[in-house]
């Protein structure tokens, strides 16, 4: 079974920096495991590597699609497996780096995507009524409270899947996420995870948002806002929708920036919940441990040589 390295962690933890440090040392090429970095038109809010960083190490699945093109987890898996094959054929090590847990899990393990009959199953009337009264975001919040791992792989605006998941939970008394198929590995993967003290992670997220604002995030968000009438993949992405009330004159810029920081912190919490429940992770602390790069390199070499 082909060996690959995976580097995951919550937003803002320092995955890109560590990946760029490790890649030359292990002769690796990087596959982005972020569902938003595939899009050409948005770079700041998606925290893409810079042009200089992209030149330092060869990357895959970055800037490959327009936001107006469909791109699903199935597309990601199809293109990700091709990237792995290409990297291996070139004599290098595949290094998957990102924070979209479900996408990475689907690549590493042969998850069943789009289960047959999933949408045909009837849903409990109580959840349909809840949706009518409270809206799709509140419905998703309810799912997130009941089954965080399931919520991680369902977009808030996809009320159909939220209804389905809540129905399965209420009918079976078991978590929807635990009723997915057994793990069937596609690759022999060493999964390294980055995490640290929660308050330090949150502080880094806040600082990162401030830096994004300095680099032009507002202009990027305005592009997304001005194209909101066209159906596209980024309209609900964290980093853009939070500014819509500012552009419509409903909130101040400071209010929207604070909302983005809050949303980013909540997203980091959801990411960690998914990683801890769904993937076998070897955890490292890049904020407290000065030798995190050395430790990661040692674990990688042990894995590749066994």
Curated annotation (Swiss-Prot):
The record marks 100 as: Interaction with substrate tRNA. It holds the Pfam family IPPT. Substrate binds at residues 11-16. Its cofactor is Mg(2+). Keywords: ATP-binding, Magnesium, Nucleotide-binding, Transferase, tRNA processing. GO terms for biological process: tRNA modification. It catalyses: adenosine(37) in tRNA + dimethylallyl diphosphate = N(6)-dimethylallyladenosine(37) in tRNA + diphosphate. ATP binds at residues 9-16. Residues 34-37 are annotated as: Interaction with substrate tRNA. Disulfide bonds: none annotated. Its EC number is 2.5.1.75. Gene3D superfamilies: 1.10.20.140, P-loop containing nucleotide triphosphate hydrolases. GO terms for molecular function: ATP binding; tRNA dimethylallyltransferase activity. InterPro entries: Dimethylallyltransferase (IPR039657), Guanylate_kin-like_dom (IPR008144), IPT (IPR018022), P-loop_NTPase (IPR027417). NCBIfam families: miaA (TIGR00174). Monomer. Catalyzes the transfer of a dimethylallyl group onto the adenine at position 37 in tRNAs that read codons beginning with uridine, leading to the formation of N6-(dimethylallyl)adenosine (i(6)A). Belongs to the IPP transferase family. This is tRNA dimethylallyltransferase.
